[in-house]
Amino acid sequence: GPQAIGLREMSKQTRECVECHKKESPGLYQQWGASKHYRGNVGCYECHMANEDDPDAYRHYEVTIATLVTPKDCARCHEKEVEEFTASHHSKGGRILGSLDNVLAEVVEGNRGLVTEGFPEGISPAAVNGCWQCHGSEVKVLADGKMLDPATYPNSGIGRINPDGSEGACNACHSRHSFSKYQA
């Protein structure tokens, strides 16, 4: 497919991202280069920018970013779509995590062998790879404030519970970096 070769109006921050990521993450770079976001001058920084007080924000070279892009981030440009999604049943899929159904599944499964910093007592691998992949996880930020717990992210579950308090994952249907409405 088409490859990103440089936008005339690319922000300074995105230009700096691209200089490194076209070498370090060529697949992501090429997906973005074939996207409507690329053609609309929406780059890495425009989606990943974060405020310093965001729970998952960290300094990356000269900018403050978050690895995780949430519906709150997408709402900067897609306010109507995010309002519709937030009002839908889909965005609430992660709420099953606190339900009796989830507790029962974890008790029946019994295996709490996946131990991470965010789950020192262990968590069920069946929950992580089963339930959470569709319903969404509650994404946990590790103590360093930069890394996300690998048991909870990457996760594209439609009802993911994000560190910024938003629910849902736009990329459950609109895959990351290509953002195709046709894939949805």
Name these PLM-found stretches.
Residues G1-A184:
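Short sequence/structural segments immediately N-terminal
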